[in-house]
């Protein structure tokens, strides 16, 4: 039974799931909008919002914490110096999920996930 299970497994092993979320997070930070399946988008929202909250502090410890999660210098710098300052006055709700279509091959619900631009 699933009672209060804290996250979606997405049909993957633990390491595969963490790699997937890391790669999706890098993609959304670089392009600010991506299309993926709805369950992945919902799981990614939680992951990215925690990163942005950490990055908002802007100090070297925040930089290290974000880099530990993303393992990508370019993306970490963009998140800490460009993306996070936009959300300085916003308490959460940094992303938006918009349902788009049903994928033809497997009827998976697709959605855009994007960073909210004020």
From Swiss-Prot:
One Gene Ontology term of the molecular function aspect: structural constituent of ribosome
GO cellular component entries: cytosolic large ribosomal subunit
Keywords from the named record: Ribonucleoprotein, Ribosomal protein
GO biological-process terms attached to the record: translation
InterPro entries registered for this protein in UniProt: Ribosomal_bL17, Ribosomal_bL17_CS, Ribosomal_bL17_sf
HAMAP family linked to this entry: Ribosomal_bL17
NCBIfam families membership: L17
UniProt record similarity statement: Belongs to the bacterial ribosomal protein bL17 family.
Subunit structure: Part of the 50S ribosomal subunit. Contacts protein L32.
Protein name, as recorded: Large ribosomal subunit protein bL17
